[in-house]
From Swiss-Prot:
Annotated source species: Dothistroma septosporum (strain NZE10 / CBS 128990)
Protein name: Hps1-dma1 cluster cytochrome P450 monooxygenase cyp3.1
Residues noted as binding heme in the record, renumbered to the chain: 260
GO molecular function: heme binding; iron ion binding; monooxygenase activity; oxidoreductase activity, acting on paired donors, with incorporation or reduction of molecular oxygen
Protein's pathway: Secondary metabolite biosynthesis
UniProt keyword annotations, A-Z: Iron, Metal-binding
Region span, Disordered: 183-205
Length: 317
C-alpha cells in the first residue's frame, strides 16, 4: 500500500504546484481580474494566499486540508457524475412514461430549436426554465443514492434514536432507505423535540416527509409544486408549475456548510447530457437478462448492468 500512497501524494502535490504557479503568476503579472481560475484547486490555493496575507505569514500550499479536499474532488467528482448519468439513462429506459413526458417537455421549452430542426445549444440548455427536467434529475439523485453515505462528527454528547453517541464520534449517514426511499421509522416525537436544536426542528418542518404510499417509486412529479395533474390540452412546458428542491428528504449531496460544493456542476452536467441524449435518441427497453436493478457500491453506487438500445428521433414538427 505504501507505493500507492506515495503515488497518490506525488500526483496531488504536482497538481497543487501547478495551481500555485498559476496563482503566483497571477499576482506577479498584476492581471488577477483577467486570468480565469480553472478549477476548485485554483480557488483553494487563492484562499490560502489570501488567508496567509491576512495573517502575515507565508502561504502553506502543501498542508493536509488542501491535499484531502483535492483527493475528495477527484474521487467523488468523477464517480458521482458517471454514476448519476448511468442511473438516469437506466430509469428513463425502464419508465417509458417519464421518458416520453420529459421529451415532450424538452420540445416545449426549446420550441425554437424544435421548429428549426436543430439541437439546443449549451447556453440554451443551461439557461432555460425546465421544471420537469429539474424534477427528473432530482428524482434520479433521490432514488439512485449515487453517494451511498455521508459523514459528520458529533460536536457534543448526544443520542440518536435512543443510542448514546459521545462527542467526537464519526457518524455515518445512509443516503437511502427509511425517510429517503422507504417509509420513515417512527420515533418518540417528545424525546426528539427536546434533544434537537431549534434550527434542526425548523429544518424538519421546512422539508416534509414523503408519502409512504409512493416513496419507493420513481416519480419525478413529487418535486413539482403545485402537482401538475392532468391538463387539457397538455401543458408540456409546465408553465404554471415550479420545481421545489425541498419537497422532501434527499441527501445525495449532504447539507449545510459541509455539503458537496460540486453539486451545482453535477446538476449542470446532468442537465446538458440528459437533454442531448433524449433530444436525439429514444431509449428502447432492453432484454430482461440485461436489465438488472442491482448495483455495485464503492465511493459511488453504479448499476451492475447499464445497457442501451437506441433509436434515433426526428427533429422538427
Amino acid at each position: 500500500m505504501g507505493t500507492y500512497y506515495r503515488r497518490k501524494d506525488q500526483f496531488l502535490l504536482a497538481k497543487i504546484h501547478e495551481a500555485e504557479a498559476r496563482m503566483t503568476g497571477e499576482d506577479s503579472s498584476g492581471s488577477s481580474a483577467r486570468i480565469r481560475r480553472r478549477s476548485a484547486l485554483d480557488h483553494f490555493v487563492r484562499q490560502e494566499m489570501d488567508a496567509a496575507a491576512r495573517a502575515g505569514r507565508a502561504p502553506d500550499f502543501l498542508h493536509g486540508p488542501i491535499r484531502d479536499e483535492l483527493l475528495g474532488y477527484i474521487i467523488a467528482g468523477h464517480d458521482s457524475s458517471t454514476s448519476a448519468l448511468s442511473w438516469a439513462l437506466k430509469y428513463l429506459t425502464t419508465d417509458a412514461r417519464v421518458q416520453h413526458a420529459l421529451r415532450q417537455h424538452l420540445h416545449a421549452v426549446h420550441a425554437a430549436s424544435w421548429r428549426e430542426g436543430r439541437t439546443p445549444s449549451v447556453a440554451e440548455i443551461t439557461s432555460i426554465r425546465a421544471p420537469y427536467l429539474d424534477a427528473v434529475i432530482q428524482e434520479v439523485f433521490r432514488c439512485a443514492y449515487t453517494t451511498p453515505f455521508t459523514l459528520r462528527e458529533a460536536t457534543r454528547d448526544t443520542q440518536i434514536m435512543g443510542h448514546f453517541v459521545p462527542k467526537g464520534t464519526t457518524v455515518w449517514f445512509s443516503t437511502s432507505g427509511p425517510s429517503f426511499t422507504r417509509p420513515a421509522i417512527e420515533t418518540d416525537r417528545k424525546t426528539s423535540s427536546h434533544s434537537r436544536s431549534p434550527t434542526a426542528l425548523a429544518d424538519k418542518q421546512r422539508v416534509p416527509a414523503w408519502s409512504p404510499q409512493d416513496v419507493a417509486l420513481f416519480r419525478p412529479e413529487r418535486w413539482l409544486r403545485p402537482d401538475p395533474g392532468p391538463s387539457d390540452p397538455p401543458d408540456f412546458a409546465y408553465s404554471h408549475v415550479d420545481f421545489n428542491g425541498n419537497a422532501g428528504p434527499m441527501m445525495a449531496f449532504g447539507s449545510g456548510p459541509r455539503g458537496c460544493c460540486g453539486k451545482r456542476l453535477v446538476y449542470l452536467s446532468m442537465r446538458i447530457l440528459v437533454t442531448l441524449v433524449l433530444w436525439d435518441f429514444d431509449l428502447l427497453p432492453c432484454p430482461t437478462r440485461l436489465s438488472s436493478d442491482e448495483s455495485n457500491h464503492g465511493t459511488a453506487s453504479h448499476p451492475k448492468q447499464c445497457y442501451l438500445r437506441l433509436a434515433t428521433t426526428t427533429h422538427g414538427p
